Regions:
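Conserved acyl-donor/pantetheine-binding loop and adjacent beta-alpha core of acyl/acetyltransferases
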Residues: 78-118
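Conserved acetyl-CoA-binding loop-helix of GNAT-fold acetyltransferases
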Residues: 121, 127-140, 166
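Conserved GNAT acetyl-CoA-binding A-motif
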Residues: 112-116, 142-154
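Conserved beta-strand-loop-alpha-helix junction that forms the acyl-donor binding cleft
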Residues: 117-126, 151-161
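Conserved active-site alpha-helix within GNAT-family acetyltransferase domains
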Residues: 132, 155-173
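Conserved GNAT-fold acetyl-CoA-binding loop/helix
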Residues: 29-51
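A short helix-loop-beta-strand connector motif used in the catalytic cores of GNAT acetyltransferases and
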Residues: 50-64, 82-89, 115
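A short beta-loop-alpha structural element at the N-terminal edge
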Residues: 7-23, 34
Length: 190
């Protein structure tokens, strides 16, 4: 299954795509951006190539957008079960507090939701619907397993927050982790 929009193809990452996906993740990681650069959005999740590869093979958790005109990975969206992501302290913490939040009248939980993100699109491709294509594709991949998507957005990242609210994510509350404040957000997979 692949989605095509003009020259952009959205699909699951293959082993050969992982190094380029990692480069894109590093390009927009907060640790690699100066303060003014962060205004255009940033990611805070760090993964090695091996971890990305494991996420891809075990969870179908690495969705990429490729520009066919130059055969370049220009977007990515990660996602995985709370169990798979539990080695990351942030995700372990989020899983432990999910039931403190309600979405569509029910308490969130790890059994019926998955962790979405980060989502990352190369600056030169932003505003062209690539993020929406990544989200649409990932929802189809995870819908058979989970009815709800859960993500977090740093309060210092208004660009990301705007993307998520524009795409119907509901802000279900705040939480603090490691000295940062985050929005907890949710969306149905179908």
């Amino acid at each position: 299954m692949a989605m095509v929009n003009e020259n952009i193809v959205v699909r699951l990452a293959q082993d050969a795509d992982i190094p380029e996906a990692k480069q894109l993740l590093e390009r927009y990681h907060a640790k690699n951006l100066a303060g003014e650069q962060r205004a255009n959005g940033f990611v805070t999740t760090d993964m090695t190539e091996q971890q990305l590869s494991e996420l891809s093979s075990a969870e179908s958790g690495v969705v990429i957008a490729v520009d066919r005109s130059c055969d370049k990975v220009i977007g990515l969206l990660l996602g995985g079960s709370w169990q798979f992501l539990s080695p990351w302290p942030m995700f372990k913490y989020m899983a432990s507090i999910l039931n403190e939040y309600r979405y569509q009248g029910k308490k969130l939980d790890a059994a019926s939701s998955y962790q979405y993100g980060p989502i990352c699109v190369a600056e030169e491709y932003r505003g062209q619907g690539v993020g929406e294509l990544l989200l649409e594709y990932q929802r189809k991949v995870f819908a058979p397993r989970y009815p709800v998507i859960v993500t977090f957005v740093n309060v210092l990242n208004p660009r990301s927050y705007a993307f998520h609210t524009r795409n119907q994510f509901e802000d279900v509350g705040f939480f603090n982790f490691n000295g940062n404040k985050y929005h907890m957000m949710a969306l149905p997979t179908s």
